[in-house]
Amino acid sequence: MLSPKKTRFRKQHRGRMKGKACRGNKICFGKYALQALEPAWITSRQIEAGRRAMSRNVRRGGQIWIRIFPDKPVTVRPTETRMGSGKGSPEYWVAVIKPGKILYEMGGVAENIARKAISLAASKMPIRTQFILLEESHN
């Protein structure tokens, strides 16, 4: 499971997910990618489930890059606790995803294999996503 080794503060505000992703919205490493179409919090467990689904499908061939990292702690209060008495303790980590953000990239495999593997990863995600290809620029 992905999580930061060390953070400056233990707890964070929830924040808002306004607008589109202006960074991390282009393919950088591979040839194929999975792009988010909706804003959401994606947990480290969901990221890991998607990675496992992809790597099991392609077996030894190809290479996978995870373009997101869960760096936001989510706090949960104990059950049957009255209101007040402070914020809950950090339970799990999430990555804040805006529309347009690249979640996974893939390379070194045929397009049909990449499409199948990325669709398996997409089924593990809590949001609508799309499969995108790297456009080769023709000079």
Swiss-Prot record:
Keywords: Chloroplast, Plastid, Ribonucleoprotein, Ribosomal protein. One of its GO terms (cellular component) is chloroplast. Pfam families: Ribosomal_L16. The keyword Ribosomal protein applies. It is found in: Plastid, Chloroplast. GO terms for molecular function: rRNA binding; structural constituent of ribosome. One of its GO terms (biological process) is mitochondrial translation. Signal peptide: none annotated. Its main location: plastid. The keyword Transferase does not apply. Belongs to the universal ribosomal protein uL16 family. This is Large ribosomal subunit protein uL16c. The gene is rpl16.
